[in-house]
Amino acid sequence: MKHLTMEMVTVILLSATIAVDAGTRPSFVSDDMIAKASSVVNACQTQTGVTTTDIEAVRNGQWLEGRPLMCYMYCLWEQFGLVDDKRELSLNGMLTFFQRMPAYRAEVQRAIRECKRIAGGDNCQYAYTFNKCYAERSPRTYYLF
């Protein structure tokens, strides 16, 4: 996973649900990013048992509350190095990425601030709650791989 750029890792962090129109992806999520992320996506699907159908449901705005989906979201964070030594989400890369995209900056900062406060539970529950919250507050910047 070391070959991934910070931009890729950041987009993957953001990529835990829907875009503006359900089922579409943000313009900055390229086909190349999706291709590079595929090995991690496949590994996390295998590890957690989440189905492609469940992932697609989230992309379409249907939030299923199954444990496999919740743990899949945390697995993505973990595999892309977005979890610190306390096994908590590290948002520095995400914030740095969006500093270069002024159209999204304030929206992203607000969503992160609000969602970090309300997310809780174990790692899987935290990832799911944060992702769902973020998707609701910044749908333009979010997509689930």
Spans of features found by a protein language model:
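Mature extracellular/luminal domains of secreted and GPI-anchored eukaryotic proteins, especially small
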Residues: 19-145
